[in-house]
Amino acid sequence: PVCAGIAFAALAALLLGAKACRTVKLDVAERADRPNRRVFLLAAGFSALVYAVCLVAYFPGGFSSDTVYQCRQIQGVMPYTDWHPALHTLMMAALLKLVDHPAFVLAVQGLCYALAVGYTADVLARWRIPKWVILVITAYLSLNPSISNIMLFPWKDCAFAIAVLFLGAQLLDVHFSQGESLSPARCLSLGATLSLCAILRHNGVAMALAAGAWLLIALPQRWKRILPALLIAVLMTLGIRGPLYQAFGIERQRTQLDETFGVPMTILANIYDQAPESLDDEIVEFLEDVAPRSVYVEHNSVGDWNDIKWYAGTIYFNKPYTLLQVYG
């Protein structure tokens, strides 16, 4: 109830803030200027400089458990899977082929982020957004310690965030121009960005679909320019998840079932660990069929919703369960 109340209050505050901002007007040009290389280079350079200082200070960066899992795939210890987006794993593998050091992956990641910051500043400058607004946004994106910290890890979340930042700037450009900026080259670029957003996180497809729907709803008169971008996004996504993944022998995610019922299974595991007497015989029989109670006690972390996912490969998939068997 407390968390729900906080979430509701935060949502209400956001909605009220958005409503209040309706009266705030920015002077936007009727037509965009030519790309502003000076603004792009200054913003990207500043972001890259800040990131370089952080990387040197915390050299060679950090690895999360997700990244360790991906590196084991790259090293051949385990087969490539799409548990963590395989495209991101393949990108890391390609970079490590060039320079076999994790800091190189982080350096490229920081460069990509700096380019996204520079592109965002360039879009705002081309539409003559006030300089102080561009300065504040660039400073926030470059100096925010939370962003600097997470960018020191080669997480899929970082790659996804970079793609989303590019997408946000592209959508602003489309919005300000009412779709007129969608040249063939920019349609290709927008489609590629939408595809990357859909692939680099398993739930990123929701954002890509929402962005595509917004484009069609907000600019129905420009559907002839929008549809090619959406078609490119679909074809690119299918091409990567299909032929490309097949060429590299990417195993389809075997734990999609686990993703579906991981939360209720975690709740049951917590109860089975802490208060098994409160479960009825049918539930106990099901849990014992998956694994003996000693396994739950050994591996369970009370309140950790990720627990079932992390141990799925070694514990919970010794039997070929289906959704009907689980829920039936």
Regions found by a protein language model. Name each.
Residues 1, 59, 86-89, 98-102, ...:
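Aromatic- and kink-enriched transmembrane "portal" helix at the membrane-lumen/periplasm boundary
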Residues 1-53:
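Start-transfer (signal-anchor) and selected internal transmembrane alpha helices
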Residues 41, 120-143, 162:
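Transmembrane-helix signature of polytopic, membrane-embedded enzymes
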Residues 58-70, 79-91, 99-104, 319:
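Extracytoplasmic catalytic/substrate-binding loops of multi-pass membrane glycan-assembly enzymes
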Residues 75, 119, 159-178, 190, ...:
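Specific aromatic-rich, kink-prone transmembrane helix
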Residues 107-128, 166:
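Transmembrane-helix motifs of polytopic, lipid-linked glycan transferases
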Residues 186-201, 212, 232-237:
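Membrane-interface alpha helices of multi-pass inner-membrane proteins
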Residues 250-328:
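Membrane-proximal stem/loop segments at transmembrane-domain junctions that anchor or position
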